[in-house]
Amino acid sequence: MDTGLKDGRLAPCPNRPNCVVSQGGDKRHHIDPIAYEGEKSAAVELIQQVVQGLAGIRIAAQTEDYLHVEFRSKMMGFVDDVEFFFPDSAVIHMRSASRVGYSDFGANRKRLEKIRVMFQQRWTRDGKA
C-alpha cells in the first residue's frame, strides 16, 4: 500500500491498470484534478461530504490538506485506496488504486469521475463557484 504524500505529491501508480493519479503519471494512469474557485477549506469539507455519502467507505487518514479514504467492494470485500490532496492552488489532486489484483475494469477511474461530478454539482448548487 503506497499512500500518503511524499514531497508534496501523491504516489505514482504502479505498472498496473488498476490505478489513476492526477499528479504525474503516464497517459494510461492520468486523470485530471478537480479545479474549483473559492475557499480551500470549503472544498475539503465538500469532498468529505461527497465521499461520506458513498457506500463502503472508511476514513483512514486526514489532515487539513490530505484525505485518505478506503473503499470496500460489496461483493468480494476488496479495498481500494482513494486519496485527495488539497495544495494551496485551487485544485484537488486525486489518486485511486486497488490494493490487489491487476485490472479493475476501470472502477477506480469511474469512482473518481463520479466524485468529480458530485463535487462540481454541489459546489455550483451551493453557490461556492
What are these regions (language model features)?
Residues 1-129:
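Ser/Thr-rich, low-complexity intrinsically disordered terminal regions
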